[in-house]
Amino acid sequence: MPALTCFVDGAAALLHPPGYALAGDFTLPLPFTFSAAATITDDADATAVEDSNSIWSPSLSSKLFRIDGWGFPYFGVNAAGDISVRPHGSATMSHQEIDLLKVVKKASDPKCCGGLGLQLPLVVRFPDVLKDRLESIHAAFDGAIQLQGYESHYQGVYPVKCNQDRYIVEDIVEFGSSFRFGLEAGSKPELLLAMSCLCKGNREAFLVCNGFKDSEYISLALIARKLALNTVIVLEQEEELDMVVEISNKLCIRPVIGVRAKLKTKHSGHFGATSGDKGKFGLTTIQILHVVKKLEQLDMLDCLQLLHFHIGSQIPTTELLADGVREASQIYCELLRLGAQMKVLDIGGGLGIDYDGSKSGDSDESVAYGLEEYAAAVVHAVKYVCDRKNVKHPVICSESGRAIVSHHSILIFEASGASTNTAPSLSSIELQYLGEGLSEEALADYQNISAATLRGEYEACLLYTEQFKKRCVEEFKQGTLGIEQLAAVDGLCDLITETIGVKDPVKKYHVNLSVFTSVPDFWGINQLFPIVPIHRLDEKPTARGILSDLTCDSDGKIDKFIGGESSLPLHEMEGHGGGYYLGMFLGGSYEEALGGLHNLFGGPSVVRVLQSDGPHGFAVTRAVAGSSCADVLRVMQHEPQLMFETLKHRALEFCGQHDDDSVVNAGVLANSLAQSFDNMPYLVSSTTCCLNALTNNNGFYYCSGDDFSADTVSVATSVAGEDENWSY
């Protein structure tokens, strides 16, 4: 650390122009260096792990980033310092673990280097994890049912709004077929895709129709019942009943009807806004009685078979959960007493995700229970109420979309560089400009800085420094101070501040990503997700940073992280930047569905990865390039082909009218324009980098990008063929 008195003394000599004398003795003491006690710092964000370990290891990184908390049982850190994926959860054997960095290499390396040539950002999906989540939820309920002697079964549905991707929905229908797992729709397009997918599912699987409805929605739902799909129309508003009755009579299709109840039970978190008397959806007890009476008058009371409720996502505790389930169970029993042929209690969503690994019910970022505790609380609450009322136990249905799909999808993005507000060195500050043009008031401010330095009053020194800088800025605005003088003042003040130790140590890591497209919940509702480097975890992170995206928007950043942190432990960028890969985890629900097109940054590339018995343990079974510039332009009603023709004509007009070389140059320009339309909107290195990691994962080689392509990769349906062609 440079001695503060050194550069204050040096600057002082330049601050005494001829004929101008400052009062007081400005003979400074010998240079000294601040001790740790004298340094004003803010180490609140430093963790015990960072402070106490000079030798680093992957296990320490796992603790630092809480991976064993939020990542269990699907994610860990391997001996090489890379994130490893355990596709089968706790049942994953060591040789089945997948090195995430190798998956990124396979996807992003150019074809000439053996990769698929996909551009980052990249979403990596693991259907094996999705399958394990479905099986784990079903097993939790099945275990609770057997243990407690519950006399019915569990039969869940996946709310497709969480992620409507075709392959995710098809996988859920396939993986859940053996235990009658169904789908939930909340709009007409979602209903159409659910109907189509369930044609390949279990005949007993529920198709739950939620959301606001018009005559076309209700007609589709009734047609689905005609197609032998186990469809239930859930009334969100009392008025919907009249449409259901009218259209069912016209189509001669007897409906199965459910009602959504507005419970009194409400949780206080952000996600609890849809619950309680003031909730957006559902019927009050008065409205439910109106529905029962009308169905009874129409001799259709036997059609009422399901009660649905939802007290909000991310239910924090099983106590709150059980309270809501007991209330709903009472309504269920009352409907049976009134003559409805009730069969199903749909407890809605709410099965939470532990985003921060704390296993706490004190915030929206975590929950104080696991799958087994959740299922046990639900089964016990329903059984308790029904047994007291001597009512047959209903089928228990849940809509646990977040818990099903969050873990199986990982967003990978690259940090292209890092910047910090590091003060310039004393030698780089052109101090001679400080002797020109400063007002008497500014020179007096400097006198105060010098005096405070002599006395060792560093707090006062900071105050005088701030005042000195502020005064000089005002003089610059008034035109009495030149830019050279202002730059010298800025450099000197920054150097003083950094030397005392209050300079912000947090770096800004520039990431090849759009927060608005890929992490919209962070921007919209301050939802936090675990973000971790996917490699170099055998090295100690020596920097702290926030993430700044590509968009031209001040909100395009991630500056809040799990654990209440305002910065993230990161590694120093190597070389000229790039090659530092971060993963955002637990974002498989909602993020892709909610993402927008701010600055026309489109969706990321996507790969689907299965665990295999190949030499490297995985197979890429599907790879799709992200949205190109042409794709996102079409969304905004531009026509890329016409745009290209216009620009091509312009190139020929201004670059191709003199000689043969100009014509060639015009052709090169046209080809470059065409390539720009085909490429993704995100940054691309001028030289395509092969992520060919050496033993320490830090060495890369480069090759020509001529073979780079962002074409969609289609793969044969044969598993053996997939493994042979795409295994890494």
Curated annotation (Swiss-Prot):
Disulfide bonds: none annotated. GO terms for molecular function: arginine decarboxylase activity. It catalyses: L-arginine + H(+) = agmatine + CO2. Pathway: Amine and polyamine biosynthesis; agmatine biosynthesis; agmatine from L-arginine: step 1/1. PROSITE patterns: ODR_DC_2_1, ODR_DC_2_2. CDD domains: PLPDE_III_ADC. Its EC number is 4.1.1.19. Keywords: Decarboxylase, Lyase, Magnesium, Putrescine biosynthesis, Pyridoxal phosphate, Spermidine biosynthesis. Substrate binds at L345, D346, I347, G348, G349, G350, L351, G352, I353, D354, Y355. InterPro entries: Ala_racemase/Decarboxylase_C, Arg_decrbxlase, De-COase2_CS, De-COase2_N, De-COase2_pyr-phos_BS, Orn/DAP/Arg_de-COase, PLP-binding_barrel. The keyword S-adenosyl-L-methionine does not apply. The modification N6-(pyridoxal phosphate)lysine is found at K161. Its cofactor is pyridoxal 5'-phosphate; Mg(2+). It comes from the Eukaryota. GO terms for biological process: arginine catabolic process; putrescine biosynthetic process; spermidine biosynthetic process. Belongs to the Orn/Lys/Arg decarboxylase class-II family. SpeA subfamily. This is Arginine decarboxylase. It comes from Pisum sativum (Garden pea).
